[in-house]
């Protein structure tokens, strides 16, 4: 907050119209002499009066009293089980990590001793489409905390073309509807963190726009600091006003596929794991369960960043059975969503078991993981949905041939009694 000096008194800037004092949620504009002020909300009101638009006068968002629910890690995992198929170990590790983080925020002050609890950020290691983002999104929804999701590959150091690391916090503030206090207890998910690894373990002697330099920039906000961010994102400039965010209590979750990490682990472990499995996927699963911080340093993440990601959980590559379950079992399963869409038009949509397996096999062939399932079904359903209103009172059955050979779906007219 800026202050105006008058003699020996220091007074906060106050809107000359509504008499409200400047704060992080109410920005103040001043005239050239710095003796008349107007807040952004009065500017909106004036615009509405002058131009005759019925523009809603918005007061700043009031802070939510975010309280830690009386939940346990088991309850967190049980909620994840409703939306995330498989990945049992990862869900358990993630639930404990999230539980400890929010317990530290809301219950640590109840203890009488002076022991300070440091936050433990989380690293999720697993192939594309294995559920890394979904884990974070699901628990953020359950805990009713804002979440910002970004791709590490779009980030650059300050001063370079691209997205500033600090813009992540702008997204979080937007997800919190401008409530700074709520944003400061939110979750930031940074995907593809492995894509900004150094190409070698030796520190670069040249400027590194999207590798080590971005890791260093991330380190500053992940470890906990006061960061000034532009309220509407974009680049900073000297005359701009900022909102200050304290990142000390924000939970940072980083995710990445880390392709090639298995090679590093095989080299380290030798015959301790390698050769005991007939299936390559099972071998990789066993290897990833033995990840240690040093392995990630060898991969190309800087030691300082790894030192801030205390909880490491590995996710397995999904198999055909997992894919079929993802299609049908979660509370918001893709098949259930399409069945609801069809039911609105009076149509019953059914999938044969072989059709579900064919969809799962196609997603595995494309190597897109679970996130590729929706696009496969969408491609398959376009023609049907185009004519859907004409099929009222029909059952539509999707067979294996529809998926594999682009055959027509079975149309069965229901008997209306």
UniProtKB/Swiss-Prot annotation:
Q: Which Gene3D superfamilies match?
A: 1.10.8.60, ClpX chaperone, C4-type zinc finger domain, P-loop containing nucleotide triphosphate hydrolases
Question: Which parts of the sequence belong to the ClpX-type ZB domain?
Answer: 1-58
Organism domain of life: Bacteria
State the Gene Ontology terms under molecular function: ATP binding; ATP hydrolysis activity; ATP-dependent protein folding chaperone; protein dimerization activity; unfolded protein binding; zinc ion binding
The residues that hold Zn(2+) are 15, 18, 39, 42
Any one GO BP annotation for this protein: proteolysis involved in protein catabolic process
* Binding-site positions, ATP: 127-134
Identify the SMART domains for this entry: AAA, ClpB_D2-small, zf-C4_ClpX
> What keywords does the record list, in alphabetical order?
ATP-binding, Chaperone, Metal-binding, Nucleotide-binding, Zinc
State a GO cellular component annotated for this protein.
Answer: HslUV protease complex
Regarding protein family, the annotation reads: Belongs to the ClpX chaperone family.
Subunit annotation: Component of the ClpX-ClpP complex. Forms a hexameric ring that, in the presence of ATP, binds to fourteen ClpP subunits assembled into a disk-like structure with a central cavity, resembling the structure of eukaryotic proteasomes.
Q: What is the stated purpose of this protein?
A: ATP-dependent specificity component of the Clp protease. It directs the protease to specific substrates. Can perform chaperone functions in the absence of ClpP.
- Protein name (record): ATP-dependent Clp protease ATP-binding subunit ClpX
What is the species listed in this Swiss-Prot or TrEMBL entry? Campylobacter jejuni subsp. jejuni serotype O:2 (strain ATCC 700819 / NCTC 11168)
